[in-house]
UniProtKB/Swiss-Prot annotation:
Stated family: Belongs to the arthropod CHH/MIH/GIH/VIH hormone family.
Pfam families, per database record: Crust_neurohorm
Gene Ontology molecular function, alphabetical: neuropeptide hormone activity
Keyword Disulfide bond among record annotations: yes
Keywords: Disulfide bond
Protein name stated in the entry: Uncharacterized protein ZC168.2
Domain of life: Eukaryota
Cystine connections: C44-C82, C60-C78, C63-C91
Gene3D superfamilies: Crustacean CHH/MIH/GIH neurohormone
GO biological process, one term: PERK-mediated unfolded protein response
GO CC annotations on file: extracellular region
KW Methyltransferase (keyword) present: no
Length: 108
């Protein structure tokens, strides 16, 4: 089918494509979040429960992405004191459905 330089070129192209695709996927899947010792240490029991801790971390990350232009330290503020700050509550409000918020207000 392909002989000589064409075959080498095709093999090189396939290897290059696989390498680029794999490295791009790795960049997307890797967690690039840097956690400070005070937020993720043993003093924060919330993070011991991995699914809950992961959701809380993600809320802070997404909130930071939305508000980093006005509050550049939002990620740190949100995670401070083991997610008990007003900044975390503000972020949580952003991602709480309106209907649920209305239900909570009526209930309490």
């Amino acid at each position: 089918m392909f002989v000589g330089p064409h075959r080498c070129f095709l093999i090189s192209l396939i290897v290059y494509t696989l390498t680029v695709t794999t490295s791009s996927a790795r960049l997307i899947l890797e967690d690039t979040t840097v956690r400070s010792e005070e937020d993720s240490g043993p003093s924060c029991p919330v993070l011991a429960d991995e699914p809950v801790g992961e959701v809380m971390e993600r809320i802070c990350d997404m909130c930071h992405e939305l508000s980093s232009h006005s509050r550049p330290n939002m990620r740190v503020e949100c995670r401070a004191d083991c997610f008990t700050t007003d900044a975390f509550r503000e972020c949580l409000k952003l991602f709480t459905p309106r209907r649920h918020t209305r239900h909570l207000r009526q209930k309490y």
